[in-house]
Amino acid sequence: MENNKKLRTWLDDFNLDHPLVIAGPCSAETEKQVLSIAHELKDSDVSIYRAGIWKPRTRPGMFEGVGAIGLKWLQKVKEETGLLTTTEVANANHVKLAIDYDVDVLWIGARSTVSPVSYTHLTLPTKLA
């Protein structure tokens, strides 16, 4: 029950006078790109900077993101702009790495939810307070 109460009120901590805005590139491709966009957004209504560093695909051989190196870029975004950060996670290792790099919000994309087993494994490295 306590988790449910926290989940219903987490937006209150932002003290926003506008809707929560999450923005950033679909794919983090270079450090320069990630930081440039973050600096453009920092003085806007954006509260959370998003960048996909792991890109689940329906077919192999397509661009699957820059991977864990992108987490360092998200850390720099937070340090240089003060924006909170978010990225998509698709497995338990992604979750652990994102937490280790202090990513603020993790999202689970549609391709990761098709398998109940995969979805369950995403929560294994975490324990909600």
Predicted regions and their residues:
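Glycine-rich, proline-tolerant flexible connector loops at the mouths of alpha/beta enzymes
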Residues: 50-68
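Catalytic beta/alpha-barrel core
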Residues: 84-91, 104-116
